[in-house]
Amino acid sequence: MSDLLDTIRDLAKPTDSKILMVVLDGVGGLPLETNGDTELAAAKTPNLDALAAQSQLGQVELVGAGITPGSGPGHLSLFGYDPLRYVVGRGALSAVGIGVKLGAGDVAVRGNFATLGEGRIVQDRRAGRPSDEKNAEIVGKLKAAIPDIDGTPVEIYTESEHRFVVVFRAGGGSPLGANLSDVDPQATGVQPMTAQAHDDASQKTAQLVNAFVQRAEAALKDETQVNGVLFRGYSDVPHFPSFDAAYQLKAACIASYPMRSEEHTSELQSP
């Protein structure tokens, strides 16, 4: 099966030219009620304006008309990969972005710390955006409480604010599937979802995820704000063509958020 990336690989030639690509993730907004401007339209942006005056401008439809992509497919599309063919879950992006190596059969998942009220109702999906220090403290509690689940090794990593990463290791056993539903309901005022496997290979993963959620809530029961966890974006090790080989470009990245650390992205790519 071929796609545009195969054609680009055939046509690309190395040159001395340089490209600066600026990605403002999350800057989009809806018109304000006061004057109809978005936040970006209302802002004073002399530096962006000066950069735009020296740039080639355009618009891109990242996935399809009317589809708002998540960070994974959105960034893949920006860098020329078909996000419908090359699927990378948020868990893998988060894990690799902080330098965590994934092995065959492992599953990584992106976690949010959350605030749960009476009846396990989600009050805040980001637990008030705790400090990185508080994040590390909570991760330490979870590491002590959940080193493994029924013999399956569990690794927990701090990321930033409310974000953390969990890796379920296959440990030489049967590969864990990553095809299961999210725990994060993407809304407040409701309970967290129960993970449901969508295929046989993911049955064990769903059991591990649901057990982790229960144990995490027990470990955090004395916390007033960071007392729950929400999961989304399960991913095993993805593979896609090398950016260098496809475009004949040597890429470097400066990122303010660990998920996009280019230092580690080669681990997601095929030779």
Model-based region annotation:
Residues 263-271:
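Residue-level detector of conserved catalytic or cofactor/ligand-binding positions
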Residues 17-30, 51, 218, 226-230, ...:
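Beta-strand elements within well-structured catalytic alpha/beta cores of enzymes
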Residues 207-263:
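Acidic, glycine-rich loop-and-beta core segments that form the ion-binding/anion-interacting portion
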Residues 90-215:
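A contiguous, mid-domain pocket- or channel-lining segment that forms the substrate-recognition surface
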Residues 12, 27, 52-55, 142-150, ...:
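Structural signal for hydrophobic packing residues in well-ordered secondary-structure cores
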Residues 2-16, 28-143:
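Active-site nucleophile/metal-coordination loop of metallo-enzymes that catalyze phosphate/sulfate
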Residues 60-65, 154-161, 231-232:
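Acidic carboxylate-rich catalytic motifs and surrounding loops in phosphoryl-/glycosyl-chemistry enzymes
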Residues 41-44, 159, 209, 256:
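Active-site-proximal structural scaffolding
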